[in-house]
Regions:
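Low-complexity, highly charged intrinsically disordered N-terminal segments
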Residues: 14-15
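Eukaryotic intrinsically disordered and solvent-exposed regulatory patches
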Residues: 82
C-alpha cells in the first residue's frame, strides 16, 4: 500500500508548514503482547502533531512518456512509451489506492521519482502493464478492541527479451589440451499474473489477538527460446547443435494463514499458528533438437501436470522469568507436512504417424515429506546493556518418493539446531556476536537419479545417496563513535564452514557413452553434472568501515576496505579439486549537500579477484568503478537537472586477456509548470553509447565470459501532473498548491 503499511508515506499528505512535531517509535499491536512477548513483531507508529487536524485527503499523479531508441542496431522497442495514473485516498482509519501503468522503459512502478530516475534501466527489454487496487480499514473501541482489514489485487502483463552469448574456456585435462564450449541464447517470454491478498487482524486486551491472511495467485506464462551450442577441442570443431523451446505454463497458488496470540497469566503467554499452501500447475513444452545432422533431430512434445500441498503448524509457549529485566524462556514446536505429485510424458513427433516415447523425459512420481522441529529458547541480560539469546533443538525430516521407473526412496534425517547471540547497545558503541548451526536436507531434484537432457551437451542428474549438509555460521559486528566530531568506525566479520556440502560433480565424455545407472546414452563431447557430498568448504568475509562528516562542505565521507576468501572444493570426474578465491576491495563514497538545491555524490570501488585451483590454473581479474551523481533541484526557480555518470573498467589476466571499458551517462532535465503541480522533462540514457554488459568469472575447471545485449539506450519526453484535495480544520493552501477545505470548529482552539 502507498499508505498504512508504510507510515512514512502519510507525510506526503501533509503540508510541511502544517506539521509541528513528529514522534516515531515501535510498539506491539497487542497490549498483552507487550507484557508477554518482548521479542514479538513490532509495528512502526508515527505520532504527528499539526496546526490543523487532518480529516482526509486524496491525491492523484498522472504520468505520460514518449521517446525512441538512440541505438539503430536495437530492433526492440524502437518507440518508447509510458502512461500511468495513481490515485489514493487517505484518512486516519481508511486508506484506498489504485494504480494503472503501461510502459516499455523498464520501470516497475509509476512513482514519479522512479519513472524520472536516472538509474540504469537494465539490459533486458521489458514491456509492462499492470493495474492494482488496495484498501485498508482500521478500527478501535473503548473496550480495548482494535483491528485492521487489508485487501489488495493486482494484474500484471510482462514481455521480456534477452540475448546473451557465453564462452566457457576449459583448463587442459586428460581428454584435451584445449576445449571451448559456446552458447548463444535468445529468450522471449510473456507473463500474465493475477495476485490477490486479504488479511484481517483483531486484538482484544482480554481475548488476545487473531490474525488471518489469504494469498491467491494465478499465472499464465509463455516463453520461447533459441539456443545455439558449439563445442571445440584442440582447436577443432567437435559438435554443434541448435535447439528451439516453446513453453506454456499455467499455475494456481493459494495460501491460508491463521494465528492466535493470548496469555494465561501475567507471565505465561502462547501463540498458535497454522497454514495451508496449495500449488498446482500445467505445463506444455515443444522442443526441437538438431545436433550434428538431421538424422539426430528430435521433435519433442512434453505435457506435464503437478500438484503440491503443504501444511504448517506451530505452537509456542512463553514464560516470563523476571519481568523487570526481560528474562524469559520459550518452548516451540513446529511441523510441516508436504505431499504432491508430478506426471510428465514426452513423445518424439519427428514421425507424426508413428510417435515414439522419449524415456528420458517421461516420468511420474509422488512425494510425502514430514518435518518436525522442537526448540527451547532462553533470553536474558548477562551484563548491563547486553542481551543474550540461546536456543537449541532437534529437527527431524522424513522424505518419501514413490516412482515406478526407479527404486522408491525413503530416508530420515535427524539433526540438532543451535543458535547463540549477544547484542550490546550503548550511545557511543555497539557490538553483536552470533553463532548458528543450519542444516539442509537434499531436495527432490538433487535426489532423483533421472537424466535431464534439456541441454544435450550439459546433462544433469541427481544422486539418491546424498547426505544432509550442515552450515556453521559466525558473525561479529562492532560500531564505535570516535571523539566529538561524530566519526564512526565499524567492523564486520562473517565466516562459515560447511559439512557434507552438496557440490557439482562434472564428468566429461569424449566419445558416445552409455550410462547404465541412468539408462541413457550421452553424446560425444558432452558433460554430466551430478551432485556429490564434499568436505572442506569454508569462507571468511571482513570489512572495515570509517565514516566522517565534513562540515565545511556539508558532506559525509565513507571509506571501507574489505577482504573475502573462499575455499571451494568440487569434483571433476572422480578427482576432488579445490578452488581458492582471494578478493580484496577498497571503496570510497562522498555525499555532498553543498546547498539546499545542490547535491553531489561521488563513489569509487577497486577490487581484485584472484582464483587458483589445485592444478594451479588461475583466473585474475581487476575491477575499477567510479560514479558521480549531480542533482540540482531548482535552477532559475522553475528548472531542475539530474545526471548520473558511471565508469567500469575490468581487465582479465587469465586465458582470454579481455579488457572492458564502460562509460554510462544518464541525464534528466525538466521544469515545473502549472503552478508547480506539473513537470515536463527530457530523460536520456547512455548518451556516450559505450555501455557493454560483460562479465568474467572462474568456476570449477573453466573460466566463463558472458556478453549480454543492452536495451537501455533511449530517450523519453515525460509529463507528470499532481492534483488533489486535503480536508482539515484549517483554511489555506498546501505547499504543493492543492486547496484545503475549511471546516469550522466549535469552541476555542
Amino acid at each position: 500500500l502507498i499508505f498504512g503499511s508504510d507510515p512514512m508515506a502519510a507525510l506526503k499528505n501533509l503540508s510541511a508548514t502544517d506539521v509541528l512535531k513528529i514522534k516515531a517509535y515501535d510498539e506491539y499491536e497487542n497490549t498483552k503482547t507487550k507484557k508477554l512477548m518482548y521479542r514479538g513483531d513490532l509495528t512502526r507508529v508515527l505520532n504527528i502533531e499539526t496546526k490543523s487536524k487532518l480529516i482526509s485527503s486524496w491525491k492523484a499523479h498522472l504520468l505520460a512518456s514518449t521517446g525512441s531508441n538512440m541505438d539503430s542496431k536495437n530492433d526492440r522497442g524502437k518507440f518508447r512509451k509510458g502512461l500511468g495514473l495513481t490515485t489514493n485516498f487517505f484518512s486516519e482509519k481508511f486508506l484506498l489506492t489504485s494504480n494503472v501503468f503501461h510502459n516499455n522503459i523498464n520501470r516497475k512502478s509509476n512513482n514519479i521519482k522512479n519513472v524520472l530516475s536516472i538509474s540504469d534501466p537494465g539490459s533486458t527489454y521489458n514491456e509492462t502493464t499492470y493495474a492494482d487496487l488496495a484498501t485498508e480499514r482500521s478500527w478501535d473501541t473503548e473496550n480495548g478492541t482494535y483491528g485492521t482489514f487489508r485487501a489488495f489485487y493486482t494484474f500484471g502483463y510482462n514481455r521480456d527479451n534477452t540475448n546473451t552469448r557465453s564462452e566457457q574456456h576449459y583448463f587442459p585435462g586428460n581428454n584435451y589440451q584445449q576445449r571451448l564450449y559456446e552458447e548463444q541464447n535468445s529468450n522471449s517470454d510473456r507473463k500474465q499474473n493475477h495476485y490477490s491478498e486479504f488479511s484481517f487482524s483483531n486484538s482484544n486486551d482480554k481475548w488476545g489477538e487473531f490474525r488471518w491472511n489469504q494469498l491467491i495467485t494465478y499465472n499464465n506464462n509463455k516463453d520461447w527460446q533459441s539456443l545455439y551450442i558449439y563445442n571445440e577441442e584442440n582447436n577443432l570443431q567437435t559438435s554443434k547443435s541448435l535447439m528451439h523451446y516453446d513453453n506454456l505454463n499455467k499455475n494456481f497458488h493459494v495460501k491460508e494463514d491463521v494465528s492466535y496470540v493470548n496469555s494465561i497469566t501475567d507471565r505465561i503467554g502462547y501463540t498458535l499458528e497454522s497454514s495451508v499452501d496449495i500449488n498446482k500447475g500445467k505445463n506444455h513444452s515443444l522442443r526441437i533438437d538438431t545436433l550434428e545432422s538431421s538424422t539426430t533431430q528430435t521433435y519433442l512434445t512434453i505435457p506435464s501436470k503437478l500438484r503440491n500441498t503443504e501444511w504448517n503448524g506451530n505452537a509456542q509457549l512463553i514464560y516470563i522469568l523476571n519481568p523487570e529485566n526481560d528474562t524469559q524462556i520459550s518452548f516451540d514446536y513446529s511441523v510441516k507436512y508436504e505431499n504432491g505429485w508430478k506426471h510428465q510424458f514426452a513423445w518424439n513427433m519427428l514421425s507424426p504417424t508413428n510417435p515414439q516415447t522419449d524415456e528420458a523425459n517421461t516420468y511420474s512420481y509422488k512425494i510425502n515429506n514430514l518435518t518436525q522441529k522442537q526448540e527451547v529458547s532462553f533470553h536474558f541480560f548477562p551484563f548491563q546493556k547486553t542481551s543474550c539469546d540461546i536456543s537449541a533443538g532437534l529437527k527431524e525430516s522424513t522424505l518419501k518418493r514413490k516412482e515406478k521407473e526407479m527404486d522408491n526412496y525413503r530416508k530420515t534425517f535427524i539433526s540438532p539446531t543451535v543458535a547463540i547471540s549477544f547484542v550490546h547497545t550503548d550511545i557511543t558503541k555497539s557490538w553483536s556476536a552470533a553463532y548458528r548451526l543450519h542444516n539442509f536436507a537434499p531436495n527432490i531434484v538433487q535426489l532423483r537419479p533421472q537424466i535431464d537432457n534439456s541441454n544435450p551437451y550439459m546433462l544433469r542428474s541427481g544422486n539418491p545417496n546424498l547426505k544432509q549438509s550442515y552450515l556453521h555460521s559466525f558473525l561479529f559486528n562492532c560500531n564505535r563513535m570516535l571523539g566529538k566530531h561524530n566519526h564512526t568506525i565499524g567492523v564486520i566479520i562473517n565466516a562459515s564452514i560447511r559439512q557434507h556440502s552438496p557440490v557439482a560433480k562434472t564428468t566429461y565424455y569424449n566419445a558416445e557413452t552409455y550410462l547404465p545407472e541412468l539408462q541413457y546414452t550421452a553424446p560425444a563431447h558432452s558433460s554430466l553434472i551430478s551432485f556429490e557430498n564434499v568436505e572442506g568448504y569454508w569462507d571468511i568475509k571482513g570489512k572495515l568501515i570509517w565514516q566522517a562528516p565534513i562540515r565545511s562542505i556539508k558532506s559525509k565521507y565513507t571509506l571501507s576496505t574489505g577482504f573475502n576468501y573462499e575455499h571451494n572444493p568440487y569434483y571433476i570426474g572422480e578427482n576432488k579439486t579445490t578452488t581458492r578465491t582471494y578478493d580484496p576491495s577498497l571503496e570510497h563514497f562522498l555525499l555532498c549537500s553543498l546547498t539546499k538545491r545542490l547535491k553531489v555524490t561521488i563513489s569509487a570501488n577497486t577490487h581484485y579477484v584472484h582464483s587458483i585451483n589445485t592444478e594451479n590454473y588461475t583466473g585474475k581479474t581487476f575491477y575499477q568503478t567510479a560514479g558521480a551523481m549531480l542533482d540540482i533541484s531548482q535552477i532559475c526557480k522553475y528548472f531542475y537537472l539530474s545526471s548520473h555518470y558511471n565508469f567500469i573498467f575490468s581487465r582479465d589476466y587469465g586465458i582470454n586477456k579481455e579488457i572492458n571499458r564502460n562509460h554510462t551517462l544518464n541525464l534528466n532535465v525538466g521544469c515545473k509548470v502549472l503552478n508547480r503541480k506539473g513537470d515536463i522533462s527530457i530523460a536520456a540514457y547512455d548518451l556516450l553509447n559505450s555501455h557493454r554488459t560483460f562479465n568474467s568469472q572462474m568456476y570449477s575447471n573453466y573460466i566463463q565470459n558472458t556478453w549480454t545485449n543492452y536495451y537501455g539506450r533511449f530517450f523519453t519526453i515525460n509529463f507528470a501532473y499532481r492534483f488533489g484535495k486535503v480536508k482539515s480544520n484549517y483554511e489555506g493552501t498546501t505547499n504543493d498548491g492543492s486547496i484545503r477545505e475549511y471546516r469550522p470548529m466549535s469552541g476555542k482552539i
